[in-house]
Curated annotation (Swiss-Prot):
It comes from Xenopus laevis (African clawed frog). Residues 571-597, 669-681, 715-724, 1066-1078 have a biased composition (Polar residues). It comes from the Eukaryota. This is CLIP-associating protein 1-A. The keyword Repeat applies. Coiled coil: none annotated. Residues 279-293, 550-569, 645-659, 789-800, 1042-1054 have a biased composition (Low complexity).
Amino acid sequence: MEQGMDYWLGQIQQKDVGKRLQVGPDLIEYLLDRQKSIDLEQDQTLLDRMVDGLATSWVNSSNYKVALLGMDILSELVSRLQDRFRTQLGTVLPSLMDRLGDAKDSVREQDQSLLIKIMEQASNPQYVWERMFSGFKHKNFRTREGVCLCLIATLNVYGANSLTLSKIVPHICNLLGDPNSQVRDAAINCLVEIYRHVGERVRADLSKKGLPQSRLNVIFTKFDEVQKSGTMILSASDKNFDDEDSVDGNRPSSASSSASSKAPQTARRGVSLGTARRPGPSSAAAKTGGTAKEGAGALDEEDFIRAFEDVPNVQIYSSRDLEESLNKIREILSDDKHDWEQRITALKKIRSLLLAGAAEYDNFFQQLRLLDGAFKLSAKDLRSQVVREACITLGHLSSVLGNKFDHGAEAIMPTVFNLVPNSAKIMATSGIVAIRLIIRHTHVPRLIPIITSNCTSKSVAVRRRCYDFLDLLLQEWQTHSLERHVSVLAETIKKGIHDADSEAKIVARKCYWGFHSHFSKEAEHLFHTLESSYQKALQSHLKNSDSIVSLPQSDRSSSSSQESLNRPLSTKRSPTGSTVSRASSTTSKSTPGSLQRSRSDIDVNAAATSKSKAASGASTAPFISVAALPPGSYASLGRIRTRRQSSGSTTSTASTPADTRGRSRAKVVSQSQPGSRSNSPGKLLGSSYGGIATGPQRVPQMPSSEKRSRIPRSQGCSRETSPSRIGLDRFGISQQGRIPSAMRVLSSSTDLEAAVADALLLGDSRNKKKPVRRRYEPYGMYSDDDANSDASSACSERSYSSKNGGIPHYLRQTEDVAEVLNHCASSNWSERKEGLLGLQNLLKSQRTLSRVELKRLCEIFTRMFADPHSKRVFSMFLETLVDFVIIHKDDLQDWLFILLTQLLKKMGADLLGSVQAKVQKALDVTRDSFPFDQQFNILMRFIVDQTQTPNLKVKVAILKYIESLARQMDPTDFVNSSETRLAVSRIITWTTEPKSSDVRKAAQIVLISLFELNTPEFTMLLGALPKTFQDGATKLLHNHLKNSSNSSMGSPSNTIGRTPSRHSSSRASPLTSPTNCSHGGLSPSMLDYDTENLNSDEIYSSLRGVTEAIEKFSFRSQVDLNEPVRRDSKKESELGSCDVGIASPASDLRGGTDMVEGGRMALDNKTSLLNTQPPRAFTGPRGREYNPYAYSDSINSYDKTALKEAVFDDDMDQLRDVSIDHSDLVADLLKELSNHNERVEERKGALCELLKITREDNLAVWEEHFKTILLLLLETLGDKDHAIRALALRVLREILRNQPARFKNYAELTIMKTLEAHKDSHKEVVRAAEEAASTLAGSIHPEQCIKVLCPIIQTADYPINLAAIKMQAKVIERISKESLHQILPDIIPGLLQGYDNTESSVRKASVFCLVAIYSVIGEELKPYLAQLTGSKMKLLNLYIKRAQTTNSNSSSSSDVSTHS
C-alpha cells in the first residue's frame, strides 16, 4: 500500500519515543524519493501540520536522539522545498533557537548547521536574523550564548554584506552586561568578529552606545589584538555601518552589482558549516586573538600575575589620603547593591594603592582588616567578574604583604574554598589560584586547619584540590610554620592515603613524602600505622616518581615574590631515583647515583665531618636506601626541592643549574686526584681560572715552626701547595681587604690560598679586576669557629694588608639591599655567607631598612635558624643577628616570639663551644633590647605550648633565661594570667624532672626568683593552682626561706643578689613588706638590715603568712554573681589575726583569677603577716616546721616524688610511712593520666576507673583532687588518641552531673575546652563534646554561662560558633525573664551575625536560639531585631508560631492527661 502524507503525519504525531526512532529514518527516505513524496508539494495544509509537529514534538523533545532526528528531517525538507520552506520559518525558528541552548553539544551543533542551511537555501541571512532577535533575550543563558556563536558562524560563512549589522549590535551590547560570564565572552567575541569584517567604524559606533569605559577598554584591546594579528576581513562598506537607513546587507556592492543578493553558491559551499559552532576549537575563536581560553573561563597564575599590575596608576599623598581611599573602597564593596562594575573598579584600586606603596603606611594594615567583610562579600558575589577581581586582589595582597596578610588570609580562606566546586570555570579557577598564591606567600599556621578540614569534603573535586594545596604547602613552607599542626597534617594525609578517589590518593602519597621531608619521625610513625598494602603503594610511589617533591608546573612558571627568583636549587635525581644531595648517604656503599667526596678544599675537617654524618645517617628506618631519603631533609633556607630531570639521562652527573646571577655551574662528581684539591668540585664553584703564569713561581714558606704546627699537614701530596696549583689559581682569586684579626679565621683552604696568592701578586696589574664572587667584604667580625681555627695563623695582618695597606676600591658598601637579601635567601651556602657579609656592612653603616625589607629579612633569618652549615653560615648569621637586633629592636616586636624561641631551641642543640657562646650573646642582647614583660609573656606561652617538646638542654636554657629576666623585671611586669599559671604549674613539675638534676635545680631557682619578684602576685597565682602544685611550691619556698635566713645570719655576703631593675630603682612593691628585701638583697645596707632584723621566729612567721595566704585568700575571691560583695568585718579581723596552721582548709573553693576587692583584702591581710612578730615564741629553729602528715593526705604519689628535691631527709622518712587509702587510688590514676600521648591502653583504663569513681559520692576525694582531675582532663582533650579524648569528655560530663557546684570558678576554661573539642576530626569525640556541652548548659549558672558564650559566638568560626549557639539556646531555657533582659544586648549581636552565616546549620541554630529568647520575653525581643530583612523576619515569625503551636499542643495534652 502506498504511504502518503496522511500516514506520515500520523506517525509524526505519535508520542512513543521508540517508534519515533524507527519511523524517522523511514520518513527521511520518503522525503528523498521525489516520486513517492509527490503529494508533499501539493497539499500545503498537510505540510504545515507536518512541519509544526516536527518543530514542536520532535525538535523540542527531551530525548536528544529524537531532537537530532527531527532536525535531520527538517534539513531534508529544506533541501527539498528550497524557497518554499520560507513560509515555515515562523513555525520552526522558535524551536531551533531553544535547541541552541541544549545541554548536548551534538544537538547545539546540528541546530546551528540547520540554521545556516536555512539562511542559504530557504531564505537569506538578514531575513532569518530579523526573526531571531528574541534569542538575545532568551531566558536560558546557553541559548543566548548559542545565538552569539551562530552570528559568528553566519559572518564567517556569508560575510558582513549579508546582514544589517547596525540592527544586531545593540542586542549584542546588551549581552555585555549579562549575569553569565560565558554569554559576556560570547558577546565580546561577536563584536570582535564584526570588527574583523567591518573595521574601525565598529569602534566609533560602540563609543556612541554609552557603554562603561572599563568594558570598552576590554573590547578595544581585543580589536587591537585582531588588527595586529593580520586577520582582518573588510568585506562590508565602512560608510554604511552606523547609518541604519543606508546599511543593507542585501544591497549588492559596486563590485558585484549584477550578482544575486545571496552569496554565490560556490563560495558558500567552500566553507564548512561546522567551523564556528563553539568558542573552543572554532576558527572564529582562533581568529579573534586567542580568546579560546577566556571563552572557557579558566584562569591560571600567569593570568593573575599579569592582572596584578594591569590597573590604573594612582598616587598616595598622605596617610589620610590613603585612609579616605580605602574607606570609599570599603563602602562600595560592602554594599552589593552598588553596580558590579563599580565594585570591580574598587577592587582594582586596592591593587593600584598597593603598587603605589600603601603597605609603607602605618594605617594601611588597620584599614585592611576592616576590608575582611567586603572581601568575603565580593568572593561570594554572583557575578563571576567580581569574584575574579576579588581573587586577583587577594592573591596580590598575599604576594606583596606575605605573612602580614595573615589575618585577612585566615578570614577569607573559607569563603574562597567555597568557590572550588563551582560549576563556572572562571569562579572555580579564580578561587584555586587565589588559594595557591596565599599558600605560597602567606605562611601562617592558622591556615592549615582550614585546608585540612576541606580535605574531608564530600566533593571529590574539592578533596583532590585540597591535597594539591597541601602538597604545595609542604613544599613551600618552612618546618617551624608546620610544627604546631603536625598531628593534624599526619591525620589528614592518612585519610588521603585511604581516600576512595584514586587521584586524591596519588596526591596524598605525594603529600606524605613532603611531610616526611619536614617531620621524618612522625612520618615514619604514620608509615608503620598503615596496612601493608598502603605501605607498598607509598614505596612504589617513591620508586616510580622521578620527582617526589617536584613543584607543579604553575609553581615553576611564575611567582611574583622575590624569593621565587632565588628558589633553592633542587637535589638531582638519577634515573634510578637515588638522590644526590648534600646529606650523606645512608649506605657505606658508593653507588653511581650517590657518589660523594669530602669537600676538603672548603673545610680542613670535612673528611671527618663527612664520616660522622654518614655514620649518623645510617639509622634511618624504615627507609633504608638512599632513594628513600626525601628531598629537603634539612628544614633550612637551602631546603632541597627536586626538579624534573630528563629520563634520557643515564649518567650520574647532575644537570647544570643556573645560579641567581645567570651563570651556569656544573656540579661534577669526580674522584679525588693525587695532584691537587683545587680541582675538586667545590673549587669549580668558588674560583675562576684566569690562565697560567708565565714567570717563575714561588712556593710560599711558613715563616715559623709555630705556624707549621698550627696548620694540619697532610702526609700525601694531595693537599700540599704546589707551583702548578698557584699558577692555576692566581689570576682568579678575589682580593682581600684589611680585616680585623678577630675576623681573619679561614673557613676553608681556599681562603688560605687567597691570602698566599695576594702576597705573591703585589704590583701585578691584572689583580686590579673586581672579584667574581665576594662582593661584600665586612668591616667587622668574621666567624671564629673552633673547628676552623687551625688556619687562623696563616691569616696574618701582612697577607690582608698587602694591597698598599688599605681596603681596595671595589670593597664598596652597596646600596643594593635587594641583592643582599637575595644572596641571604640563596640555596647556596657560600652565597648566603656572602649575603651576610654584605648585610653586616649595611648594618655597620647605620643603613636602616624599610618595613618591607625588614619583613623579608625576618623571614630569611627565621629560615636561617635551621641552616645546616653551622660552621660556615650559622656562626656568621649569629654575629649579624646581634647587630640587626641592636639597630632595629624597635621594629622587631612582632618577630620577638620567633627570635627568642629559636635562640632558646639552639641552646639545646649540639653546637661548638664558640657557636654556643654566640647564641648566648644573642640571647643576652635580646634580653636587654626588648620589654621585659613582653619577653616574659612569650616565655610563658612557649612553656605551655603543647606542640613544643623541648629537650632537657632547652628546658635549662629557658629556665635560666627566665631567672635572669626575673632579676631585672619590675614587680608590675609579673602578671597573674591563665597562661602564667599554666606555665608555673609546668615549672613546678619540672622541679621533679627525673632525668636531669640541672632542670630540677633551674626550675627551683625560677620559682624562688618569681616569688621574690612579686610575692603577693605570686602567692595569688599559687592559690589558683591545684593543691598538689601548691604544696610542692610551698615546700620549696619553705626550704628556701629557712636556708636564706641561716645563710644571712651567718654571712650576709652569701645572700643571693638581684640586678636592679632598669625600670625602677626600688624593688619594693606596695604589697611587699620590708622583710621581703631579705630575699633579694638589693644592697649591702639592705643586707645589714636583714641580718639585724631577721630571726628564725620572723622567718617562720613570714612563711606562715605566705602559706595562709595561699590557702585562704580565695575564699573571698569569687562571690555569687547575683549577690553584691559583702564585707564581714568580723571574719576579716579573724583572718588577719588568727594563728592558722599549715594544714589544708576544708573547702575546695581555692582557685580564682578574677580577684574581687574582698579577696584582695584577704590576701593583703595575709601578706601583712610578713611584717609582724608571731604571737607565739618558738623553742628552736625547727620548732615550727611543715607537718608531713598534714601534707600526705593531699599529695599523690606523683607529687611525693616531685617534692623529693625540696624536702629534708627526716621529712621523707615520714612521707614513706603514709598508708594508701581511697584517695591514693585516685592519686595513682592521676599519675597515670599525666603520661600524655603515652601508655594509651593504661590511660584508657585509668579514665574508666575515674568514670566509676565520679559516680560515687566521695566528698573527701573531690575536696582533695577536684582541681587536679579537672586540669588533667582538660589537658587530655589535646591527646593524640581520639578514644582517649572522647573518654576524657565523658568523664568530664559525669563530673559535671555529679559535682556541678565545683565548676563555678572554672566555667570559662571548661566551656572553651569543650567547645574546641567540637572541631575534632573524629565523630566519636564530637558526639562526646556535644553531650558534655549539653550537660554544661544545665550545670553552670545561666548568667555566668552566657557571659562566656557571647564573645565566642561573635568571634569563633564553624563549628565552634554552632556549638556555642546551641549551648546558649539550652541555657536560655533556664534563665529568668529579668536576668535575660539585662544581658540581652550582649546576646543579640552574635545571633544576628549567626543568622547571616554561610553555614546553614549556624543560621538554623541562631533562629532557634532567637525563638527560645522569644518564648521567655515575648514581644519585647522585637526592637532588637530591627536590622533583620523582611524575609528573615518572616522566617523567624514562622518558627515562633510553630514553637507556640507545639507548646500549646503539649500543654493541652498534659491537661487532658491530668483530668483523665
